[in-house]
Regions:
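Positively charged n-region of N-terminal signal peptides that target proteins for export
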Residues: 1-4
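Predominantly soluble domains enriched in secretory-pathway, periplasmic, or organellar proteins
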Residues: 8, 14-350
């Protein structure tokens, strides 16, 4: 004889199902459109833009909170007028929930959430400074003056103890001890130090020196330069793959992606993008690279199977299969896409 199923058991199962579906893992890609002052929220299952949200002018970079619920956007501004704000986006609700005024700090660019999910690091180029921002309080709680020109991108290593800031104008990396609150060292890496990524184990920092056509590998603890890797054609961003085997580098001039072997520290392949600029007028890089589609921002899926690259002069995001090293899809973006961030959550707005 079958035992009757208790009503409380049925209710518990129903509540569990409702809770589970309220945070469907459907993958959302946030793409910032610099010339439109918008953020596109793309559903990665369908490839469809689920929402287009306003930011302040010149959104350049985005960072995702550790739980995937919020994207933080740095509003860089225009050539004529520097920006001084951050935009906070709720991914599930697909809406802007807060604008953070940075006051005297101008041209916010590189940014990332710290592990606590409450604070974020933000570079302020105009002030040659790295900021610590309390996102909940919408306030700057600390500032580290790099004294370097064009402090552009930021990365952390050693469990979040140290921050590394790439300074384009000075060709250097500033190292900041976040626990002690001090600048530890300034490391000269090469002309145009810009893109920066940490190895998966957090022991190395990889820096693209765009004007020198090199990539520097720095020991995050000793701060010694371990290698200088040749990487031609204006290497502008870098991103380490989750398996720790490779580092992807977007090369703006040649409009392709260099794949570096993390162990041998050598370039092992190029992934052609087969795209051209749709136009070059009124864009950050203009016609500096001719008909290049100018690939910049790179995001890699946590499972390491896919990567997305924003082509800022072609108004498109390319999806790459990292097992075959081939392009598998093009995603529509707004005008001049660049910074991106990934969330495992699904936008709920229709």
């Amino acid at each position: 004889m079958k035992k009757p199923i208790h009503l409380t058991v049925l209710l518990a199962a129903l509540l569990l199902a409702v809770f589970a579906t309220s945070f469907v893992q459907a993958d959302t890609l946030v793409v910032l459109n610099k010339s439109e002052a918008t953020a596109s929220l793309i559903d990665l299952e369908s490839g469809r833009v689920r929402a287009t949200l306003p930011t302040d002018f010149g959104p350049h970079e985005a960072a995702m909170s550790p739980d995937g619920r919020f994207a933080l956007v740095g509003n860089y501004g225009s050539r004529e007028k520097p920006g001084s704000s951050l935009t906070l986006i709720n991914i599930l609700a697909a809406k802007v929930v807060k604008t953070i005024d940075l006051g005297e700090y101008q041209r916010p660019h590189g940014l990332l959430f710290l592990p606590d999910g409450r604070r974020a690091l933000v570079t302020a180029e105009e002030n040659r400074t790295l900021l610590v921002v309390d996102v909940e309080k919408a306030a700057v709680v600390n500032a580290f003056v790099t004294a370097q020109d064009v402090s552009h991108m930021v990365e952390v290593a050693l469990g979040g103890r140290r921050a590394f800031v790439a300074n384009i104008g000075s060709g250097s990396v500033s190292v900041i001890d976040l626990e002690k609150g001090i600048i530890v060292r300034t490391i000269e890496t090469g002309a145009g130090a810009e893109g920066i990524t940490a190895s998966v184990d957090g022991k190395e920092i990889w820096v693209t020196n765009r004007s020198a056509d090199t990539v520097s590998v720095i020991d995050a603890e000793s701060l010694a330069i371990l290698a200088q890797i040749s990487c031609a054609s204006f290497p502008i961003r870098a991103k380490a793959t989750p398996d720790g085997k490779h580092v992807l580098v977007s090369c703006a001039r040649s409009a392709d992606i260099a794949v570096l072997d993390a162990a041998t520290r050598k370039e092992v392949r190029r992934i052609p993008q087969d795209l051209r600029a749709v136009d070059t007028g009124d864009r950050l890089f203009g016609d500096q690279f001719g008909e290049s589609s100018v690939p910049i921002g790179i995001v890699i899926h946590p499972d390491g199977k896919k990567a997305w690259v924003a082509h800022t002069n072609a108004d498109v995001v390319v999806e790459i299969d990292l097992e075959t090293w081939k392009i598998v899809r093009l995603l529509e973006a707004g005008r001049e896409p660049d910074g991106m961030a990934y969330s495992a959550l699904e936008v709920k707005k229709d």
